């Protein structure tokens, strides 16, 4: 059975755990519609990505 050779110091333990925290999602304002969207993601309402039409826009029902 594998066991640690040395005790993990509180500093090392804290540095390892620092990546475990939840981070708030970032949003940017869309240039065309002015709505908030995730960066590097397609705007599903308009179907635009980086100034190009990549999807057909959704119809509002």
Swiss-Prot record:
**Which keywords annotate this record?**
Ribonucleoprotein, Ribosomal protein
Write down the SUPFAM superfamilies for this protein, in alphabetical order.
Zn-binding ribosomal proteins (SSF57829)
Q: What would be an example GO MF term here?
A: structural constituent of ribosome
The record's InterPro entries line, in alphabetical order, gives:
Ribosomal_bL32, Ribosomal_bL32_bact, Ribosomal_zn-bd
User: Which Pfam families does the record associate with it?
Assistant: Ribosomal_L32p (PF01783)
Listed under GO biological process in this entry are:
translation
**Where is the segment annotated Disordered?**
1-41
Q: Where is the composition biased (Basic and acidic residues)?
A: 28-41
**What does UniProt give as GO cellular component?**
large ribosomal subunit
Which stretches does UniProt call biased (Basic residues)? Answer: 1-16
The entry assigns this protein to a family as follows:
Belongs to the bacterial ribosomal protein bL32 family.
Q: Which PANTHER family match?
A: 50S RIBOSOMAL PROTEIN L32 (PTHR35534), LARGE RIBOSOMAL SUBUNIT PROTEIN BL32 (PTHR35534:SF1)
UniProt protein name: Large ribosomal subunit protein bL32
Tell me which species this is from: Rhizobium rhizogenes (strain K84 / ATCC BAA-868) (Agrobacterium radiobacter)
């Amino acid at each position: 059975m594998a066991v640690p050779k040395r005790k993990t110091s509180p500093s090392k333990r804290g540095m390892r755990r620092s990546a475990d925290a939840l981070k708030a999602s970032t949003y940017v304002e869309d240039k065309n519609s002015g709505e908030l969207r995730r960066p590097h993601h397609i705007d599903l309402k308009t179907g635009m990505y980086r100034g190009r039409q990549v999807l057909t826009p959704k119809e509002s029902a």
